[in-house]
């Protein structure tokens, strides 16, 4: 079915040296594209890394590689926007949504106690809903979800239909959350950006879909969060491998939602 060759394109940028040398993370990006979109994609990732509000990078890496695994096409998670008047209200709602998705109050509390210490983690923290402990062994690196994308034309059609801003930030976040939630080990995801100018975050899961929350932190804060609450009784190593290596394209079909 899939005739065209696709490429995984990745960007990471940091300040005061590379990430491995202790540099401050500035920006990252993931795309999955056919070759004819390469130049435009690399240029847009370059622009993203150079113009980030977290600072001016002095290290950047952009790499691409051909994807040999078959690409799976999935639907985006259903989206709901929750308007809140403060980060406190937003965080209260986030905890409630996590609980509804199957994470116990005790485990949510254990995760929240450690969020500040994880703010420098570049990828995601994997947190087991049974033991209430972090179970990925990646330390400051975190688990980086890769090889997913949402072709622009299809995303713009979806955004128009649901009256959502056709912003690349929403496209990237929803593509990632849709990939993350599709595997058996996934229970729920809690995320907000490390961008000081962006305070909207989300909670996502198989049952509730993608729940945007308009304030999960104060403006000016560079502390981000990405926690995957997972069922540790499932095969966690396979889950991590799939998050990093399984290529996924989002393709919204209107009649799928009706």
UniProtKB/Swiss-Prot annotation:
Keywords: ATP-binding, Biotin biosynthesis, Ligase, Magnesium, Nucleotide-binding. It comes from the Bacteria. NCBIfam families: bioW (TIGR01204), PRK01322.1 (NF002360). Homodimer. Belongs to the BioW family. This is 6-carboxyhexanoate--CoA ligase. GO terms for molecular function: 6-carboxyhexanoate-CoA ligase activity; ATP binding; magnesium ion binding. One of its GO terms (biological process) is biotin biosynthetic process. Pathway: Metabolic intermediate metabolism; pimeloyl-CoA biosynthesis; pimeloyl-CoA from pimelate: step 1/1. Catalyzes the transformation of pimelate into pimeloyl-CoA with concomitant hydrolysis of ATP to AMP. It catalyses: heptanedioate + ATP + CoA = 6-carboxyhexanoyl-CoA + AMP + diphosphate. Its EC number is 6.2.1.14. HAMAP family: BioW (MF_00668). Its cofactor is Mg(2+).
């Amino acid at each position: 079915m899939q005739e065209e060759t696709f490429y995984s394109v990745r960007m990471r940028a940091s300040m005061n040296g590379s990430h491995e040398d202790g540099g401050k993370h500035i920006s990252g990006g993931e795309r999955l594209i056919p070759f004819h979109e390469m130049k435009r994609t690399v240029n847009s990732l370059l622009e993203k890394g150079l113009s980030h509000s977290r600072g001016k990078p002095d290290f950047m890496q952009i790499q691409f590689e051909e994807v040999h695994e078959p690409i799976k096409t999935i639907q985006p998670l259903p989206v709901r926007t929750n308007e809140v008047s403060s980060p406190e209200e937003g965080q209260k709602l986030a905890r409630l949504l996590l609980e509804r998705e199957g994470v116990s109050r005790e485990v949510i509390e254990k995760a929240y106690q450690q969020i500040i210490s994880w703010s420098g983690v570049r990828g995601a923290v994997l947190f087991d809903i049974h033991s209430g402990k972090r179970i990925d062994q990646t330390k400051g690196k975190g688990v980086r979800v890769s090889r997913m994308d949402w072709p622009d034309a299809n995303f713009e059609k979806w955004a128009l239909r649901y009256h959502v801003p056709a912003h690349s930030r929403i496209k990237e976040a929803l593509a990632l959350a849709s990939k993350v939630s599709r595997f058996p080990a996934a229970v729920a995801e809690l995320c907000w950006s490390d961008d000081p100018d962006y305070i909207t975050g989300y909670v996502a899961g198989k049952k509730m879909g993608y729940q945007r929350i308009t304030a999960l932190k104060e403006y000016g804060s560079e502390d981000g969060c990405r926690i995957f609450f997972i069922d540790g009784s499932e095969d966690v190593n396979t889950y991590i491998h799939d998050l990093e290596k399984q290529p996924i394209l989002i393709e919204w079909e209107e009649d799928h939602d009706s």
